[in-house]
């Protein structure tokens, strides 16, 4: 039930993001910049360290973590990590 609610809430955001992209010009300028943007996102995604469950290990906010994880500062490492916060929240 929660998953359905999350999907319903995210659908307008996903659609809005796809509609914001500009169409390509005849000279291909937008196509080149879009490709560069995709390349930057791909490089960032390769830098993400994942835990065994496939969720990100490090974070800067709760939105960087999986749904049941929370972004917490770990004094021993000096970094913020996504930590499991439990099934009932």
Swiss-Prot record:
Instruction: From the UniProt entry, list the residue stretches annotated as the region Disordered.
Output: 22-42
Sorted keywords for this record are: Cleavage on pair of basic residues, Disulfide bond, Secreted, Signal, Toxin
GO MF, any single term: toxin activity
* Propeptide segment residues: 22-44
Asked if the record carries the keyword Signal, the reply is yes
Which residue positions does the secretion signal occupy?
1-21
Q: What is known of its domains?
A: The cysteine framework is VI/VII (C-C-CC-C-C). Has the PXY motif between the first and the second Cys residues.
- The name on file for this protein is Teretoxin Tan6.8
């Amino acid at each position: 039930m929660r998953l359905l609610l999350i999907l319903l809430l995210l659908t307008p955001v996903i659609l809005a993001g796809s509609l914001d992209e500009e169409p390509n010009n005849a000279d291909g300028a937008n196509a080149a910049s879009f490709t560069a943007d995709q390349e930057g996102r791909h490089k960032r995604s390769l830098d993400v360290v994942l835990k065994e469950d496939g969720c990100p290990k490090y974070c800067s906010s709760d939105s960087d973590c999986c749904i049941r994880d929370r972004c917490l500062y770990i004094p021993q490492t000096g970094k913020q990590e996504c930590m499991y916060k439990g099934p009932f929240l």
